[in-house]
């Protein structure tokens, strides 16, 4: 599967399991919501999350993206990542929200919540994609 096909799959499927690498080399997995902003895969998370600590140490990551129904087609994406912290992350966090949910009723409130929750943005660069499997 071409990487562009894997990225296209995310346009219509936002549920994923993210795998990062712990300090001891074992996998750490988290259910996440990914979105597509300017043809790049992104997600929002907390600065204090283990996945962020892992990605800052080792930027390799794997996403298993699934449909909303869970069973059916899925795609695995091998990636490198960039963690963007506030305040630099704010525009990306707004774009992420818009990509998934449209307009927010109070953008000021949203921005305050991002600061209070210590949110950051993770950008994924897809290196390989596949297989596209139904199961």
For the regions a language model picked out, list residue spans one by one.
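Short, basic/aromatic recognition patches
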Residues: 1-16
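Structural motif corresponding to alpha-helix initiation and N-cap regions
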Residues: 3-4, 48-49, 107-108
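Alpha-helix boundary recognition
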Residues: 8-11, 56-57, 115
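Short beta-strand segments
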Residues: 14-47, 53, 61-65, 74-76
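Generic structural signal for secondary-structure transition and capping sites
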Residues: 14-15, 60, 105, 129
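AMP-binding (ANL) adenylation modules
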Residues: 68-70
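Charged, gly/pro-rich active-site loop segments
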Residues: 73-135
């Amino acid at each position: 599967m071409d990487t562009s096909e894997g990225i296209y799959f995310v346009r219509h499927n936002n549920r994923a399991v993210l795998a990062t690498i712990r300090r001891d080399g074992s996998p750490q997995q988290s259910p996440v919501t990914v979105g597509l902003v300017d043809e790049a895969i992104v997600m929002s998370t907390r600065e204090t999350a283990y996945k962020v600590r892992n990605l800052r140490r080792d930027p390799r990551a794997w996403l298993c993206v699934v449909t909303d129904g869970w069973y059916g087609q899925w795609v695995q994406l091998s990636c490198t990542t960039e963690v963007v912290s506030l305040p630099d992350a704010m525009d990306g966090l707004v774009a992420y929200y818009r990509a998934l949910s449209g307009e927010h009723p109070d953008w000021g409130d949203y921005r305050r919540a991002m600061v209070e929750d210590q949110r950051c943005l993770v950008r994924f660069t897809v290196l390989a994609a596949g297989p596209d499997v139904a199961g």
